[in-house]
């Protein structure tokens, strides 16, 4: 498998902004496990997980040195750490990292340990498959969710409108902002959330960002297929129409998930496509999160329903000297006790769920879930973000952006030895 040579990226300035580690020295006779997480600081998942980490430390005699990052910052920092040969033991990750990190050779093969893990039967085949590449298990899941269209019901009731079911329903509300003093919805245009949202809108027209070919490699075929290019053009035009019709804030072109989730949780916007981790905001923002309902993501009238399915892996780094202890901590994260405490509404385990809307209403959308292909995605993700910017910031036409993205995806695949010729 192709091994990517990673050049060092200077991110030292980022580290100074991170949360201080939980622990800094090992207990007598124990190991120190370097853990990198990406939870929302101060939210329920962090609070419950800190308690569970302390319990694990007491039970094992090991110490966890935990540092928190955003996913984007973690991704950049792990590339630097891998290039320098100074990696942590265990990190949170996203599905987009599976192919990239595996191709780079920086994550451990957990297949043997996983097969011996007594709790593995609590995971469905689809979850295990999401942790697997080339028939090797390289991750332990800690969270699974799909995306849904969250709605502040009181806002829509006041506005006298029904929950939008289609793109056309959204675009018809061009007077919503003027009448209600807030925007109807929003989109992420930067960071990992932007490419995830774009993937869904493409899937609603039956499009893939890269399709498997007969030789086992991948290719974006839009520029070779007039119908596909026309559909991709419609997707980028949708972004522009949202701005032009004042459905979303003009400033959204510079926003990532941090701004969009915050805006919805605090009632600044009336609807948003996001995940059920926002259940945590019911306790931190009770005044604005009490009227939220869960709906399918609006789709084009000439398209089909789709959502993003995300099963997040924990990776043990190949360079770790504490793989056994890191595996024990990773499987502790995935244990029924820990999942019920910290991830009850979004657990990858089949025996952990709740009766809340955050669990059952999201799960009802899973049949329309789509995922990224198992290829190196860092270049593709950035190209997807850049393609949105070409429309919303650079003034390119929707067709120009779609055609450019098709070429950019194939260029990334070629760079990583994954392009079907």
Residue ranges and their predicted role:
Residues 109-123, 207-234, 284-287, 299-307, ...:
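Short, solvent-exposed loop/beta-turn-alpha elements that line the ligand-binding surface or hinge
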Residues 28, 51-123, 154-165, 262-266, ...:
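Extracytoplasmic "Venus flytrap"/periplasmic binding protein-like
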Residues 274-289, 300-387, 420:
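C-terminal lobe and pocket-closing loops
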